[in-house]
Design a protein with these regions (language model features):
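Conserved N-terminal beta-strand and adjoining loop/helix that marks the start
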Residues: 1-17, 90
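Conserved Nudix-box catalytic region and its N-terminal flanking loop in Nudix hydrolases
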Residues: 12-51, 55-58
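Short, solvent-exposed aromatic-acidic interface loops
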Residues: 23-25, 66-67, 107-110
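Residues that recognize and position ribonucleotide moieties
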Residues: 28, 84, 110
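Functional cleft and adjacent loop/helix regions within the main domain
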Residues: 31, 37, 78, 140-143
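Active-site segment of metal-dependent pyrophosphate-handling enzymes
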Residues: 54-98
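Class I (Rossmann-like) S-adenosyl-L-methionine-dependent methyltransferase catalytic domain
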Residues: 69, 74-81, 120-123, 130-131, ...
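NUDIX/MutT-family hydrolases
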Residues: 88-92, 99-134
Length: 143
């Protein structure tokens, strides 16, 4: 089975995180996508955030573990249909505005502070709750 590295980014602004309704899948997810050759997960997270939403993010250092990329709040794996298994690095990024410029992957979006009615895979809500509460340990890294 094919394996692909991917990223998900929970952008947050004024205590809420951005969720998009994925056109093809029909479920609420954070922005994200696959890593390009030679890209680090953090570079991919910043690129996907910018490409999908028009937002620029600052990725706070949220882990005390030396060598952990800024903004990394988790890792999960899921089957992505014909794309095989996505090995997914999950990030949080602070953004200065809630003005989203959607791309062709979604038309609906919303800023949420509760994940009780978000639906979709349980880990989307679990990671979303973590993104809302993750606190910086040191300096932010711009994406």
């Amino acid at each position: 089975m094919r394996r692909t590295f991917s990223v998900a980014v929970y952008p947050r602004h004024q205590g809420k995180v951005l969720m998009i309704r994925h056109k093809r899948l029909g479920i609420w997810l954070p922005p994200g996508g696959e890593l390009m050759p030679g890209e680090t997960p953090l570079e991919a997270a910043a690129r996907e955030l910018r490409e999908e939403t028009g937002l620029e993010g600052r990725f706070p250092v949220v882990s005390d573990i030396d060598g952990t990329p800024a903004g990394l709040i988790g890792y999960e794996e899921h089957v992505a249909g014909s794309k095989g298994i996505h090995m997914n690095f999950v990030f949080v990024a602070d953004v200065d505005t809630d003005a989203v410029q959607p791309n062709d992957e979604f038309e609906e979006w919303r800023w949420v502070d509760s994940f009780d009615d978000i639906g979709g895979p349980p880990n989307v809500a679990q990671l979303g709750r973590l993104a809302v509460t993750a606190r910086p340990r040191f300096n932010d890294v711009s994406g």
